[in-house]
From Swiss-Prot:
Protein name as catalogued: Major strawberry allergen Fra a 1.05
Domain of life: Eukaryota
Species per Swiss-Prot/TrEMBL record: Fragaria ananassa (Strawberry)
Pfam families reported in the protein's UniProt record: Bet_v_1
Keyword Methyltransferase: no
Stored PROSITE patterns: PATHOGENESIS_BETVI
Biological role stated in the UniProt entry: Possesses ribonuclease activity in vitro.
Length: 160
């Protein structure tokens, strides 16, 4: 088994506490509301929403994937860090055992946020993950993030 790590970073004008509430803590409700074409629904299969919780994410029509199952590995509300593993679903091919993600929000000097994301692809055997495959997924995640940011800018009294 190999592990391939990819890191990305982008910025937002939204401060970390507000962004964490919307983009992380309430994503299961907010994203299907503002982007049903991307995520149809999210449901807890097991757990209470905290560490160890298993969630099924069903994607919208037109998505290349039907659904995935996430396991929450960590939530640090004080330091705005969230980690989870994608453990099941059609996004995991016969080459990937699991994908672990960590998202950390830090305050930027202008009052907004710097979003740091790390993805660890745990492969089966000696398979290598192509960077363009990862970039396509990151672009979709970045698009969802921009939708959340736009929603927060348009609704300044939500997630305060």
């Amino acid at each position: 088994m190999g592990v391939f790590t990819y890191e990305t970073e982008f910025t937002s004008v939204i401060p970390p506490p507000r962004l964490f509430k919307a983009f992380i803590l309430d994503a299961d409700n907010l994203i299907p509301k503002i982007a049903p074409q991307a995520v149809k629904c999210a449901e807890i299969i097991e757990g209470d929403g905290g560490v160890g919780t298993i969630k099924k994410i069903t994607f919208g029509e037109g998505s290349q994937f039907g659904s995935v199952t996430h396991k929450i590995d960590g939530i640090d509300k004080d330091n705005f860090v969230y980690s989870y593993s994608l453990v099941e679903g059609d996004a995991l091919s016969d080459k990937i055992e699991k994908i672990s993600y960590e998202t950390k929000l830090v305050a930027s000097s202008d009052g907004g946020s710097i979003i740091k994301s790390t993805s660890n692809y745990h492969t089966k055997g000696d398979v290598e993950i192509k960077e363009e495959h990862v970039k396509a997924g990151k672009e979709k995640a970045s698009h969802l993030f921009k939708l959340v940011e736009g929603y927060l800018l348009a609704n300044p009294n939500e997630y305060c």
